[in-house]
Amino acid sequence: MSGPGPREPPPEAGAAGGEAAVEGAGGGDAALGEPGLSFTTTDLSLVEMTEVEYTQLQHILCSHMEAAADGELETRLNSALLAAAGPGAGAGGFAAGGQGGAAPVYPVLCPSALAADAPCLGHIDFQELRMMLLSEAGAAEKTSGGGDGARARADGAAKEGAGAAAAAAGPDGAPEARAKPAVRVRLEDRFNSIPAEPPPAPRGPEPPEPGGALNNLVTLIRHPSELMNVPLQQQNKCTALVKNKTAATTTALQFTYPLFTTNACSTSGNSNLSQTQSSSNSCSVLEAAKHQDIGLPRAFSFCYQQEIESTKQTLGSRNKVLPEQVWIKVGEAALCKQALKRNRSRMRQLDTNVERRALGEIQNVGEGATATQGAWQSSESSQANLGEQAQSGPQGGRSQRRERHNRMERDRRRRIRICCDELNLLVPFCNAETDKATTLQWTTAFLKYIQERHGDSLKKEFESVFCGKTGRRLKLTRPDSLVTCPAQGSLQSSPSMEIK
């Protein structure tokens, strides 16, 4: 068979073929409605095929028949057609197919239906071939009007051809059954490996590429999280491969995704040559598995856990050095921050407690100094007890450190609340219902105004009365106290003066 065109009928069937051709040309579709050639769709289960699909299938069948040794397959099919074609059945089908303007359809389309033991295999082969052609040719536009008539005539011709093939299944069913597996397997292999020729007049938006379409289909549908159509042996091999790779290197990326083919070992600080080789081997193994249609199991994951754990350990060691609480220490020149670290020694613990107690002893001379002094003394005693408990307890123990931190935080908040209550009584525009942020804002504005009015004289006087290192009030002699007391009185009476 040299081309996709219809073959000439044998000499003994020539006259009948000519009559059928004349009848088909004159009567349109009348040849398709003969009572002797009518078959139900449940018996044959034929499907519609567009011109593009039929042209592709015809090219594939022609190439397979040319590749067959000594034309054995073609001879068998011709003998089956000669034995089955009645006086006007096969030739009438050829004439009807040629008249409609579409490519002719003849019984070569269903060679597997010639077997007597499996008469329904023609439907299965048609469905498989149609699905493969649809996946390769893409979305082909269907024509209307004359195209529908041509398709109907092609379907009628296919029915006639399939009927003739079914009629020949009786005497010649056994020799033709041997040709079925070879044709079917070779067709599937050709679809999977060798790209078919493009159609002469494609109706799609772009010419089809069967090989690229199949490769893209395999690449896109095979999602790593799903396992589709993979035998159990391949699953076991894939799992064993993953286990071996995991045992070889634990800090590297064991089995990379196709999109992420970079080497994850190069980012780690302690990477060596074996880890790099194992990661590159895993990438190559994955590429081979992709071509062999091996999916990845659902329970597959990336081995990033140990790197994350090492990072957590590094961050944990850094957090031990970070300060737990930052306390403001009143210095001689400026304000400096004292960091209380977790791994502090006993001597540093004592110094910190002394500084915090010193800050708690800051008192102002005035009418409400007694109540404030009691509050500060209670906070000082609680801090002393806290320091003793921290010293007596063991250095280790996460629960003890957490409890100590919670106590210190509660005490800090309590002291902030006491100071804000004091400021609400001293600072203008503040009362007991004012929140802490608003109180601090009014306090800042009030102190700036005092500095504008009085300059640094009050600041220097305050520094001379209180110790900058301990925060305690200096013990002054009688004449000094007589000199400083009016100044302090003017300091406390300044809010009322400013309000006026």
Curated annotation (Swiss-Prot):
Disulfide bridges in this chain: none
UniProt record, GO biological process: cell differentiation; negative regulation of transcription by RNA polymerase II; regulation of cell differentiation; regulation of cell population proliferation; regulation of DNA-templated transcription; spermatogenesis; transcription by RNA polymerase II
Region (R1 epitope (recognized by Chagas's antibodies)): 481-500
Subcellular location: Nucleus
Keyword annotations from UniProtKB, A to Z: Developmental protein, Differentiation, DNA-binding, Nucleus, Spermatogenesis, Transcription, Transcription regulation
Pfam families assigned: HLH (PF00010)
CDD domains the record matches: bHLH_TCFL5
Any GO molecular function: DNA-binding transcription factor activity, RNA polymerase II-specific
All residue ranges annotated as the bHLH domain in the record: 400-450
Region (Disordered), start-end ranges: 1-34, 191-211, 365-410
SUPFAM superfamilies, per database record: HLH, helix-loop-helix DNA-binding domain (SSF47459)
Keyword Nucleus part of the UniProt annotation: yes
Ranges of biased composition (kind: Pro residues): 1-12, 196-210
GO cellular component, one term: male germ cell nucleus
InterPro entries assigned to the protein according to its UniProt record, in alphabetical order: bHLH_dom, HLH_DNA-bd_sf, TCFL5/SOLH1/2
Comp. bias (Polar residues): 370-393
Function comment: Putative transcription factor. Isoform 3 may play a role in early spermatogenesis.
Miscellaneous comment in the UniProt entry for this protein: Antibodies against TCFL5 are present in sera from patients with Chagas disease (also called American Trypanosomiasis), a disease caused by Trypanosoma cruzi. Two different epitopes that mimic Trypanosoma cruzi antigens have been identified: R1 and R3 epitopes, which are recognized by T- and B-cells, respectively.
PANTHER family linked to this entry: TRANSCRIPTION FACTOR-LIKE 5 PROTEIN
Assembly mode: Efficient DNA binding requires dimerization with another bHLH protein.
Record's protein name: Transcription factor-like 5 protein
Lineage: Eukaryota, Metazoa, Chordata, Craniata, Vertebrata
